[in-house]
Amino acid sequence: MKTVHFIRHGETEQNAQKVWQGHTDTPLNKKGIEQAKLLSERISSRGTNVYTSDLKRASQTASFLSSSPVLRDNLREINVGDFTGMSVKDTYTSNHEIFQSLQNDSFQFPNGESVKEFKDRVRKELEYIFNQTEEDSETVVVTHGFFIGTAIGLTLGFNTYPFPIGDITNTSISTIVKRETVTQVNKFNDSIHLSKESIDFPAKSKDNVITFIRHGQTDSNLEGIWQGHIDNPLNETGIKEASLLKGLFKNYNLYISSPYKRANQTLSLITENNIEISDELTEMNLGQWEGLTTSEILNKYQKNFIEALFINHKTKYGIDGESIHEAGKRVENLISDLEKKKLLMASHGGTIKSAITNLIKSPDSKAASAFTIPNNLGVSCLVPKDNKYFLWSYNVGKIGYENISYNK
């Protein structure tokens, strides 16, 4: 597996003023420099290869991660042409018809880049970066918000703007992994190096937020066993790590947990609020995979394993278990009865992956493989708007892919 971490540059004065920068060569402001320092403490050891856009705000951020980052102009932000230096809000308001045209690949920013040119540039650069990344190694790429959003959207299977994702935070980490020909989103918009409070940052500013947290570690997780409906409790590590999150999740209307011990125990450790139980949040029914390691599953059910996890989201896990599509629909049914509320829900890796895939309407061609399973205690946030769900973060927390047996 190859891993690439995409990082948005630190803040600039233009970011603070909310104006379009495009290809303008702007430096970091004081806050941006502090953000880059905090980022370096978290990720500087993650990869020997660091690539960066050649624009100053990105290369300056990259300089905190490597003494010799590789500069690439193909990693630049989209060229917004005549909009450069203009207020983002004002241009959206006065050019509504123009931005509606972003759905068309032939649209071109006035004296700037076309949608098709930019998407092609992002695709080619993704291919280049992964080709330069060795198997079982990590690469760090410092680039820009629109570039990262496009890379994530394309990986999730979308092709037409606007993609169902939220605003990307300065110095946030978004990770894409590649197994042979399959690319998956492992992490999106993670900036907890700036503040622990940002673990569920959309909940701090949005009226309606759906936040998922995967349960803490169990012995089965540690041993690489697919536990599904087996009702395991947290192990010592799971209890310790969940306890560290106490008090961070505030101002939710409802706290809901799967009935299984590992999920309910996790939510009880991070909040003192009343917890409701919902069977709709149980882990996926793994059918004949239940209680087996990945190696054992591959020995007995290799074709079913590959098809269910990477090819067809309607294929049942373990022959007679549950599909990604079915698990996602049951969570959607739960949420539809709880509209206009802030929800914090403790659930399981397969169910969270399935729910988010379904809620953002990942295209069928990528619905099985859009996301990796989130890590233990990984936090993901969705924001509903205009009868749609927008992904604002995924698998916020630890960097790297914990599911070692699954990875092998």
Describe each PLM feature range:
Residues 12, 147-148, 218, 351-352:
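Short active-site segment of divalent metal-dependent hydrolases/proteases
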Residues 126-130, 330-336:
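A short, acidic, amphipathic alpha-helical segment used as a generic capping/interface helix at domain edges
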Residues 22, 30, 34-37, 41, ...:
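Extended, hydrophobic interaction surfaces within ordered domains
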Residues 2, 72, 78-90, 131, ...:
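Acidic, low-complexity terminal tails and accessory targeting/binding regions
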Residues 2, 7-71, 113-115, 119, ...:
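Active-site-proximal alpha-helix that buttresses catalytic centers in soluble enzyme cores
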Residues 64, 150-154, 269, 354-358:
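Active-site signature of alpha/beta-hydrolase-fold catalytic machinery across serine-
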Residues 65-124, 187-189, 233, 270-330, ...:
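Phosphate-handling substructures
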Residues 143, 213, 346-347:
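A conserved hydrophobic position in a structured secondary element of the catalytic/binding core
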